[in-house]
Regions:
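Walker A/P-loop
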Residues: 30
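Conserved phosphate-donor/acceptor-positioning beta-strand/loop module used by diverse small-molecule
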Residues: 115, 131-145
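Glycine-rich phosphate-binding loop used to anchor ATP phosphates in small-molecule kinases
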Residues: 66-131
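Hydrophobic anchor at the beta1->P-loop junction of P-loop NTPases
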Residues: 21
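Conserved substrate/cofactor phosphate-moiety recognition/catalytic segment
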Residues: 34-74
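Small-molecule kinase domains that catalyze NTP-dependent phosphoryl transfer to phosphate-bearing small molecules
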Residues: 140-183
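P-loop (Walker A) phosphate-binding loop of NTP-binding proteins
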Residues: 24
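ATP-binding Walker
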Residues: 27
Length: 183
């Protein structure tokens, strides 16, 4: 643990959250993010490589990374907040007095898992400021020498909620992540 804001983890786990798993390439972000999404039963995983492939931005310099991260942050915020607006519930739920739209339950937001290199603390802070008490950061660290060509020299670790070394077997790392997230 790095001393991030872990005091409100119990409040966070009762809300639909945006989980950021970030770190250098090949640190296990996608593998752990997919496992986390399955555990949370959410279809929303924003994987940096897949996300980049959807757009024309192939720039791995600072400007390209910032653009990609800002776009991912906007999508994560949208997905997380979708369905939690009071006016939506008020308009569509008045007829039957329940919490449904044509028999379908209204969601109270959605968990979103982000698996990005995300090297810039300011962009992670921007996401947290736009989603008060709904963002949980885990910095994934690995000593493996994979995909070094894509490593970011000016990586800003910042002050995440937790630091997780991913050099162990995936099952051990997954167990530690669940323990950190209290899920």
């Amino acid at each position: 643990m790095l001393g991030g804001d872990t005091g409100n983890i119990d409040n966070k786990k009762n809300n639909k959250m945006i989980y950021i798993l970030y770190g250098q390439p090949a640190s296990g972000k996608t593998t752990l993010g997919t496992m986390l999404a399955e555990h949370l039963d959410t279809p929303f995983v924003i994987d940096g490589d897949e996300f980049r492939e959807m757009f024309t931005n192939k720039n791995y310099g600072r400007a390209g990374r910032e653009e990609n991260i800002r776009n991912a942050n906007a999508v994560a915020t949208y997905l997380n907040k979708k369905g939690e607006r009071d006016d939506w519930s008020a308009i569509y739920c008045k007829k039957d007095g329940g919490n449904s739209i044509q028999g379908r339950p209204v969601k109270e937001g959605t968990d979103v898992v982000m698996c990005l290199v995300n090297p810039y603390e300011g962009l992670r802070e921007e996401l947290k400021n736009n989603n008060q008490d709904k963002v949980f950061e885990v910095f994934l660290k690995s000593n493996r020498d994979l995909r070094k060509d894509y490593h970011v020299e000016d990586f800003e670790v910042g002050n995440p909620d937790h630091l997780l070394n991913t050099d162990e077997e995936i099952e051990e790392t997954w167990d530690r992540l669940k323990e950190l997230l209290k899920i």
